[in-house]
């Protein structure tokens, strides 16, 4: 990791109606629009979906680092993240975000350590830590037999 602080810049281009294009330094343009709940077309990324995707992405990348440092191997990760938008104290906001990771680990993995790695990743994720919204983790661990590669040394 490069030394802190890090700076990120995103640009938005839009007219008075329709889609908005989000640009960030040579990356593919991201087409955005309001979700159908706010009378949007429902065929583009919305700010609400982008926030949940940011929580998921940060969780994954933090998990990779935490698992590596903790020497906990995993085969794959699947995450479903949901958020509830509601009005609280006169402000429309995310009332809760629920992160449901399914961590696929090799058979025989210490489940307690694997759960600990998931919990630590959620707490250490900079996106989640930057939000005022409560984030609930509902983890699942699934063990699978992993074939040993020919010639691999244990």
Where are the regions that the model predicts?
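Extended beta-strand/beta-hairpin segments
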Residues: 1-53, 60, 64-154
